Amino acid sequence: MKSDFSDVRGFNYQLSTGSTSLENWLYYDPTIYELELRRGKEYFPGWNTIRLWLSWDAYFRRPAVFKERFESMVSIADRLGLKTIACLFNRWHDVSGFDNGGVYLDNFLFPQAWAYYVPLYESYVSDVVGAHGGDERIVLWDICNEPWPYNEFTEPIMGVWQAEFDWLTRMHKALKAAAPDTPVCVSVHNYLGLDGLRWVDPISDAFSIHPYYMCTSDNLYDPKRRAKYDQHIREYVEYARSVGKPLLATETCWGAETDEERAEIIRFTLETLTKYNLGFIPHALHYGATADLHTDDDSFMGETYLPFINKDGSLRAGHEVYNNY
């Protein structure tokens, strides 16, 4: 794999069975895991990277079992020709209320809080990452998925911002002590823009962005909206180049309920990203019980509908457009 990650052709993946990352780790089934990854390789032969969402709370329930399951996941992926990007923490919390779990303010904001877990998080990072120091199957450690999950940054929020950055910095230090040679990133969400890259620059070897072309049926083809998205990507690329760090899209390809509209979102998004020579990891490979990956048949839908593969294992119509890029 190229050091700039430009050849990454990936997918985010969560097991289809659990409604949170915790459930997927507690009730991990390697047979289902391999089946769903094999489906992905069948439909997308050029797929070469999987982004796995780890679960710190599953680790603390049974550390040895968690590490065995992580090794199983990485090993199965490797047999199928997939490198792994391992995401250690999650700060994305779905606006619909269908929460995936992860890290909350009490976990890092005040040492006096009962649920202040920063020292525990350090031991989790040291143990899990340390067990894979120098592991060439893991190409990138993603410290956290979408930190600073806020729509705007008012004065009260900026007080939280510093505590969150301090926590991320401690996780970076623990990670680098455990695996100094594996690149590290922090996956920032759309709303942060270039500020997000500036904020995580001190704790990143590579930049990890989530450039979703967020649209509806009414504005999917809006030329001004598309031009703004292109400009958005160009600014990311120029900033990353200015500081000499690689740039990778670890989530992308906004969802839609209709297959036709989703396929067009995929086409436009990947056409834009590859225009700037960026590797990409759409969200997400397979239908599942977690937020944004299922229809109303399996609970209420979240903000959008993002899987590439249907519940019955078939490919959503038109989603083979991925293979063009």
Which ranges hold each PLM region?
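Short, glycine/acidic-enriched loop or turn micro-motifs at the edges of active sites
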Residues: N145, P149, Y213, W254
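Short, charged, surface-exposed secondary-structure boundary motifs
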Residues: S21, T216-L220
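Substrate-binding and catalytic surfaces of secreted/luminal carbohydrate-active proteins
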Residues: P223-Y276
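Active-site flanking residues adjacent to catalytic metal/cofactor-binding acidic residues
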Residues: W141, N145, I209, T250-E251
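His/Asp/Glu-enriched short active-site or ligand-binding loop at hydrolase and phosphoryl-transfer sites
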Residues: H210, T216-S217, I281-A284
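Active-site mouth of glycoside hydrolases
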Residues: M1-S204, S242-V243, L273-T290, H294-Y305, ...
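Short glycine-rich, flexible loops that bind phosphorylated cofactors or substrates
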Residues: Y59, C215-T216
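Residue-level signal for short, function-critical loop segments
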Residues: W56, N190, H210-Y213, C253
